[in-house]
Amino acid sequence: MARVTVEDCVDKVENRFELVLLAGHRARQISQGAPITVDRDNDKNPVVALREIADETLSPDDLKEDLIHSLQKHVEVDEPEAAPAQIANAAEEIAEGIAEAGEEDVVTFDRMSEEELLAGIEGLVAPEKNDGF
């Protein structure tokens, strides 16, 4: 990798670590068949990616955004937020629904004393040992 190329890129992308991430991402894009925007001149993909960044044929901000999207497992979709009045109305409807449900939907849990718990634990059988695990 030519030092001149790296020095030219540092002017465009201040952080060297970010530069490495962006150039690596762009080099992977090139290896997957993305069209290059500069002459190859028998250079390898990372050098071509750095030359593209140095020549500003690609925007570092666009590359950064594309890198972020490629690393996300779940891409968020910006949806318009509900107005505060709609949220208040929905909260009131939920509260009314809970009040109407009343005592019928109350969930009860069985209680167990400490002695009953210990007796239950003592009654458990240990699993057989297996050589595979």
From Swiss-Prot:
The RNAP catalytic core consists of 2 alpha, 1 beta, 1 beta' and 1 omega subunit. When a sigma factor is associated with the core the holoenzyme is formed, which can initiate transcription. Promotes RNA polymerase assembly. Latches the N- and C-terminal regions of the beta' subunit thereby facilitating its interaction with the beta and alpha subunits. GO terms for molecular function: DNA binding; DNA-directed RNA polymerase activity. One of its GO terms (cellular component) is DNA-directed RNA polymerase complex. This is DNA-directed RNA polymerase subunit omega. It catalyses: RNA(n) + a ribonucleoside 5'-triphosphate = RNA(n+1) + diphosphate. Gene3D superfamilies: 3.90.940.10. It comes from Brucella abortus (strain 2308). GO terms for biological process: DNA-templated transcription. The keyword Thylakoid does not apply. It comes from the Bacteria. Keywords: DNA-directed RNA polymerase, Nucleotidyltransferase, Transcription, Transferase.
